Amino acid sequence: MAKVLYITAHPHDEKTSYSMATGKAFIDSYKESNPNDEVVHIDLYKENIPHIDADVFSGWGKLQSGTGFEELSENEKAKVGRLNELSDQFAAADKYVFVTPLWNFSFPPVMKAYLDSVAVAGKSFKYTEQGPIGLLTDKKALHIQARGGYYSEGPAADMEMGHRYIGIMMNFFGVPSFDGLIVEGHNAEPNKAQQIKEDAIARAKEAGKSF
């Protein structure tokens, strides 16, 4: 039985969001094809995802110097403890499905905060004399992204930084399989928007059967 993290970063649901509609089609298809797998939905707009701030750095510093966890301040314990939970959960999973829109050439800031929370030495990667090495070498990941314009090719291709960033992080973590399911052009060509959405949902259903 595999454990799948279904990680969504959108304030809207599948009724108004192209990425969320595509994501729902994918994960429903996946569940149907893999009824024994465990799927955990992490809604980044509802979950507590601490930012790496002064409390976190202070707590980490104290722990590294030998201070016990219970001796940290209440804020330090809450934030550091939650970051530990998130990074442990991520390392223990087998598959990751990220769902985001393309906002200002990237993804919503809650996704950056989440990726920061799971980028932990000793869990998702480790430092060696030859440089950092990813530890998640038996995982696989998929990014479902909706883009109102066209960024797969053409003059805007170099401006897309959301899908590329997640790919860079998965590579850094050692994840050997990373794919994208991209929905694009629905704002650029509103007369084709419904067909674009239907095509994306159909692709998502097929992808969910074999992920």
From Swiss-Prot:
Homodimer. Belongs to the azoreductase type 1 family. NCBIfam families: PRK13556.1. The lineage of its organism: Bacteria, Bacillati, Bacillota, Bacilli, Bacillales. Its EC number is 1.6.5.-, 1.7.1.17. Keywords: Flavoprotein, FMN, NAD, Oxidoreductase. InterPro entries: Flavodoxin_fold (IPR003680), Flavoprotein-like_sf (IPR029039), FMN-dep_NADH:Q_OxRdtase_AzoR1 (IPR050104), NADH:quinone_OxRdtase_FMN_depd (IPR023048). PANTHER family: FMN-DEPENDENT NADH-AZOREDUCTASE 1 (PTHR43741), FMN-DEPENDENT NADH:QUINONE OXIDOREDUCTASE (PTHR43741:SF7). This is FMN-dependent NADH:quinone oxidoreductase. Quinone reductase that provides resistance to thiol-specific stress caused by electrophilic quinones. Also exhibits azoreductase activity. Catalyzes the reductive cleavage of the azo bond in aromatic azo compounds to the corresponding amines.
